[in-house]
Amino acid sequence: MTATQIPSAPSAVIEASPFQIFLDTVVVRGGLDSDYDARDIAEVVFRTMRDVMPTELSNRIANELASQSAPLSELWRDTNALVRWLSQIRPVLEIRDEVFVRRIQQEAGVPLNVNAADVMAAVFSATKQVLSAESATEIARHLPGQIRMEWNRA
């Protein structure tokens, strides 16, 4: 039997998980090189978002994300146990637009060839794809001015 006579195995269609779709969206729209960068940056964007919203809202968002993807909910809550705990007890922070973006640039290790505001917008877009419109609107209410505009545009 020659190679042309060997029947090919049926190709399995593997559907990407919501978490993988989220990461892929951040990679493509943010101009990143890897899922690892997307994951690390998204975690810092989420951390900064949580800092400007009440704990109750943050917990509701985590629960909504958990219904879509446990890994995405885990990322929202924070993979760092100490930071996750602090997010539950600290008051809402007042963060200006430039500080919001600077935190992402500095804390997330955004690659030098990537604009922090662009990758933030990519995380916003990917997040809004999995959230209800009601939750997206509620988040917007707590974001500072220019950041809110970016969230609404995403």
Language-model regions, residue ranges each:
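General marker for long, soluble alpha-helical cores
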Residues: 2-154
